[in-house]
Amino acid sequence: MVDALIIDACRTPRGIGKAGKGALAGIHPQQLGATVLRALADRTGINTADVDDIIWGTSSQRGPQSGDLGRMSALDAGYDVRASGVTLDRFCGSGITSVNMAANSIMSGSEDLVIAGGTEMMSMEGRRGEGPFMMDNGNLRLRARHPQSHQGVCADAVATLEGISRHDVDALGLESQKRAALAIAGGHFNKSLVPVYREDGSLALDREEYPRPQTTMEGLSGLKPAFPAVADVPIDDKGTTYRQLILAKYPDLDITFVHHAGNSSGVVDGSAAILLASPTYAKAHGLKPRGRVVAMANMGDSPTLMLNAPVPATRKVLAKAGLTIEDIDLFEINEAFAVVAEKYIRDLELDRDKVNVNGGSIALGHPIGATGSILIGTLLDELERRDLRRGLVTMCAAGGMAPAIIIERV
């Protein structure tokens, strides 16, 4: 088996994911994806005719984000028509999965040059005009077997079951903001950031738009929990509620609501791309690798609680790599909700100074299908900046899943 080498990674800044407010909200998703694909080709000097495939993550494949966004973005970026593309959906885990699939295709010897990444325009979600989204899409047989609730209600259910308090999740949210502010001020993201321009050539965004560096613990403590109302709103003509879906599996659970906008991931727009190559191709074409993929894993857990798979996914990917927690220098666990990162740190007994060192999605935002690829690129940048060797990225995904990946510098 050959190595899957990481040649380069880039991403857009994350824009506030609200139509009429966010700087990227008026950009077509294909053009946002084209921005990073074009930048990746320019930065590395690759012949795009050599790209075997473009594997793209997009979770909300509706409207302008439908129709194989990976392929369309490549065509819009001016790639050679021989550069094929495919778009996948593993919900929040799509951006890690796209990289894992690209790495697998290279490690198997099937392909030599593959781009992975993702795009998510969350500012478009408000335009759907649909009713409450159900993971089972009305399949009552699946609902009876695996009731699946709203992600925010799941976060509060997990916090209740784990004994994680409002103070705990607020403290993690505040730390995310502090670390992100320091990272931005220190230029930690500059290596990978690609500015986004409108069709008329004017600048749309060249910096992170979502962070709130003025956040304080006092301010967070004054915010009302976001999900009590969501939990008890009827979601079908039978009056079923999101709370009832959790109680179907945990009938004695009295949910304590602790999450709000200040300790949950931000709704944003964004895109990212990562170039991977085989050693043979990289050497023949003068591409200098920055890292390699060490191991990958996927793990499922309770679909009803949804958010608990990152811990077992981490244990699985470490076992595949023959490594231990102590062998990992830095961790990126997506802050979908503060409880996810807090439980992850506690269960694995991690040093907090090694986890999400530049802040996370609470401060920076979570463009669903792109986040995993963003985190992998951010991790590689930080390993280089600190002259460290190895890092691990994982994240929860709807349906009770988590992909994971370990990378190391070369």
Q: Where are the regions a protein language model picked out?
A:
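Phosphate/pyrophosphate-binding loops at sites that engage ATP/ADP/AMP, CoA/4′-phosphopantetheine
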Residues: 39-52, 158, 162-163, 282-289, ...
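Condensing-enzyme catalytic core of the thiolase-fold
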Residues: 181-182, 273-295, 311-319, 336-350, ...
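N-terminal extracellular/periplasmic Venus flytrap/periplasmic-binding protein-like
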Residues: 10-13, 26-35, 43, 168-279, ...
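Conserved catalytic cysteine-centered active-site region
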Residues: 27, 58-112, 133, 145-153, ...
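Conserved beta-ketoacyl condensing-enzyme motif
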Residues: 23-114, 119-137, 193-207, 304, ...
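Glycine-rich loop/linker segments at domain edges
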Residues: 10-19, 103-162, 232
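Active-site pocket-shaping loop/turn-to-helix segments
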Residues: 14-42, 60-63, 86-100, 112, ...
